[in-house]
Amino acid sequence: MKVHNSRSVRRFKVTTDGKNLVSHAGTSLLGELADRAGLTQAMSEAMADCGISWNTHDPGVVLTHLAVAIADGADCLTDFEALREQSELFGDVASVSTAWRAVKATASLELRCIRKAVAAAREIVWAAAPPGGITIDIDATLLNAFSEKQDARATYKHGYGFHPIGAWCDTTSEPLAAILRPGNAGSNDTDDHLELLDQAIAALPSEYQVGHEPGDDASLVRHHIVVRADSAGASHGFVCGLTEANIEYSIGHQINSKVREALLLFQEEDWEQAIEADGTVREGAWVGELTPFMDLSSWGQGARLVIRRERPHPGAQLSMFDMSEGYRHTCFITNAVKLDDDVPALELRHRGHARVEDRVRNWKDCGLQNLPFASFTQNLAWVAASLIAGSLLAWAQMTCLDGELKKAEPKTLRYRILHVAAVLVRRGRQLILRLDETWPWASALKRAFLRLRTTFP
């Protein structure tokens, strides 16, 4: 009779006499990246005039450590202790109480300076790993408040908390900007969208901003920018702001009565087959342009409306119009210059906006799932740190990691890279981080450190 092992782990004796062991060794990659990309120094300068006398710790360094801790999985200040107990890797890390003072000292002026500091570091990173075309995705999400917090309000989904809106660079997966709003903030608030757009453009390296100030001549543009949003961004004021900044847009549009009337004039032979990312035909989906059948003058010069129909999947919730037609319809407006047979490509590009849901989920996994403070101002500082955490993870993937880790989500990076244990050995005047040779991703982490030090000497 074959005997099977009925234990989930081996039996072992536990002692506390280990020496030179460090956990979360891979997280030091993010700290070193912040140093080499100039973020730590820029953060120090941003917090220089915060109004508090610091005898031991630099508040900018404290906030950088906080961002690294959030990237490592921290979701409250007490998790900061994980870095403090790894001084051989992270240096002199502040206590939780000192970190609290740094957060409390971060007012609106400091937040503006922090955004400039991150933009300066991004310029260095992008110079080392230039992205392709720039596509910015905008989306809002809901955060529940599980305790009393300033400016928490009832949400449209009958919850209670906040309704932040954020912008991400789809090309690099970086969070560019975010606005923390009360839970009752409107989804299609034009002023919020315009403010977020200004912050997102300001977060780009300086050469990418050229020609994108409101009123700039289009001939000044050096880098083409596309902004995508769902129908919450379909306001005339926001579209006007995008047009004035010479930015191409692709924004969801409601299927209203005017769209339905235009669709009734659309001929069957005018539909084109939708395509997949590899150029193959997407079965059961068709696209068309309704611009000739609608008055889009209120959306500005060059506005176009593209519609898509697809066979609904089982269980899909359809409108009365969709049920009568037998298809599910979606549409969006864009100011893309019209080219021959470009409708399927434009629809494919707009469909890529769905990736923003992954960005939002990863943002919540970087400290945003539950805002830790009662004060709204202090939660603004936490949101700023969470954006830096997301940027550090994205920069590491852009410049240091390869293979499947280059596209991995934060949870995967933590389990495989950031939380790995190691042994610190001193040899002469050199400090050596020894990784377990049996760990499947040890070589990937070693290559990441080598790439980091080669890219940012």
Q: Where are the language model's segments positioned?
A:
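Short amphipathic alpha-helical "interface-anchor" segments enriched in bulky aromatics
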Residues: 33, 80, 343-376, 381-396
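An internal, acidic/charged active-site-proximal segment
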Residues: 180-314
